[in-house]
Structure formats: C-alpha cells, structure tokens
Amino acid sequence: MPKIIIHTNIKDADISTDFEEKVALKVSETINYPLELIHVSVTCGDRMIHNGSRAPMAFVDIDTANKFSEDANPGYTVKFQEFFTKALNIPASRLILHYHATKGSDYGVSRQPPEYKHAEYYV
C-alpha cells in the first residue's frame, strides 16, 4: 500500500487540480502497484527552506512494501524526478525524494471486495 506524502511551498492555486490523481498513476506505473492501493496527500503552501532558499520546492515521502532497494531506487528516482519537476515546474535541485521501505504488516487497513480487488497485497 504505497503512501505518498508531498510537502511543498507552492500555493494550491498553482498546482493542477488533478495533481493527486497524476501522482497516484505515476507511482502505480513506476513501482508496479495497483492504483486502488495508492494513497496520496499533498500539503501546499508550507513554509520551507532548502539550501538557504525559499524558492519553490517539494519534499516527497514515499512509503511502500517490497519495492525499494539500493539497486531499484536510482531507476525510480529518474522517473519521479522527471514527473515531479514537470508537474510542479521546479528544477531537480528543488526536489527531495525520500523512500521508506516498509512491510505489509506496517499498515493497519481493512480492504474488502468488491471495491478492493487485489487481496494479495493485504495482510
């Protein structure tokens, strides 16, 4: 169950209204998880500083089970950097991606058919 938490100092009005859906789709395609399992939360207008600058930036935390590794992460980074820099109109130097490897048992969720189809992903 991938969980993506995005903090940015970009104003809500400057981010597309379907940004969360686009993030969920990109994560689904990139790490090969069903779209129905992906949670996205975006906090806009945060007070943020990075490298001494308050220029537009984003900090993206991505938690998921059984996908992140030292070998896989660089490939994910290339895809996520391309996506987020275009979607948020920021340079790669203003984007921080933080991968968190978790276990399925780290999530407390209740998922039942027919709404949730991929039982193999649930504890």
Q: Which positions does each model-derived feature cover?
A:
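Interaction-mediating elements
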Residues: 1-123
